[in-house]
Each structure stands twice: as structure tokens, then as C-alpha cells.
Amino acid sequence: MPEVIIGQGVDAESMLPETIDMLYSNGVIQQAVITSWNLENLNVNEPGTYTVRGTAEGLDEGFQCQITVKEIANVQDVNVTTITGVEPSLPRFVTIEYADETVGAAVAEWDEIPEDLYAQAGAFDVTGSIGPDLNVTAHVTVKEVQSVEEISVDTLLGQMPSLPSSVEVTFTEDTTEEMGVSWQISQEDVESAGVTNIVGRLMGSLET
């Protein structure tokens, strides 16, 4: 199993893999689900290298895993854009910078966001934690939509069209941005010839 790197003070279980690659005598590699970890020898508050054990489905004797705990020098802020009335989607993982100038990731637990903060155009910050003493900040920009790019596509009778995953959105301050879109289309929409209007829903927020 590859070495696992965890930031000092970060919850270990959130960063451990869920599967392990098992190499059989015939050369076949197959993934097995990890069922448990024994972390008694691990101290996430003290930088260093630790050896822990785990168990996996189909592996009678268990396995060993090397975990390196590194000192964290900085947690990178996150920039997110959303549209009015849509709760911003904050990332599960954030980037951390270690003292040895390498980078890694950690799971962030974000504070709840009151609806009034994204009810109108503006900006606000959200605080998240990646450990008892480590915080991360998300800078959220809320924009009001002025217009959305109209899409026109052709398809064959009975064949679902290839629709774009994003569209250009123009905001009230005259800026534009590509935003993800979810199309509300079914097979019934392409069962007869002619022009059909398909509704798309903006996905709401982007991490930049």
C-alpha cells in the first residue's frame, strides 16, 4: 500500500483509503474493501512516521500501512462563486501546505450558511475546520443572473441530443462566467419530429 500523508492535527480516519490493491500469485490485481483500522500507534499531533495495521475483505492476516504526519505551514483559502438564492457548494477537500514545502489535502467541515447571506448579490466568508486547531476560510461571491446563453442542438428522431455541461452566464455587473447546467430532458422529448424547448437548471456555484 502506498504511504499515506496526513497533516498534523488532521483527523486520520478522514484521510485513510477505503480500498487496498491485492496482488494474487497469478499476477491478477484486485481491489478489496478495507474493513477496519488499528490506529493505536498513530499520534496525529506529533510529526513523524508511523506503522499501523488494517483488515480487508479476503485478507486473513491483515496488512500494514505507513503513515507520515507532517507539520502544516498554511491552509489555502477557497474562492467560490454562487448565484442569488442558491446555497454555495463548498469543497469537501482543501489544499494544505506542509512545512517541507510540499502540498497535500484535508477534509474540511464547514459552518452552516444562513440563507440570507446568499439571498442577494454580495460577498461573505465561511469558516471551516480541518482539525481541532486548524481553520480554513471560503470567500463566497454571490452574483445575480442577468441572462443565460441559449443553446440550440440538432438530433435524430429517438436519439438523445448531446447537450453541453456548462453555459455562459451574464451577471448584472456585466461579467460573464461558465456555469454548470443540469438539463431536464427525457426520451419522450425526442420521440417526435419538430422543435422542443428543454429547460436547464444552473448548478449554482463554482470553485475558482
Regions found by a protein language model. Name each.
Residues 1-29, 71-103, 144-176:
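Solvent-exposed, low-complexity, repeat-rich "mucin-like" stalks and linkers
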Residues 26-66, 101-141, 173-208:
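Serine/threonine-rich, repeat-prone extracellular segments and beta-strand-based repeat modules
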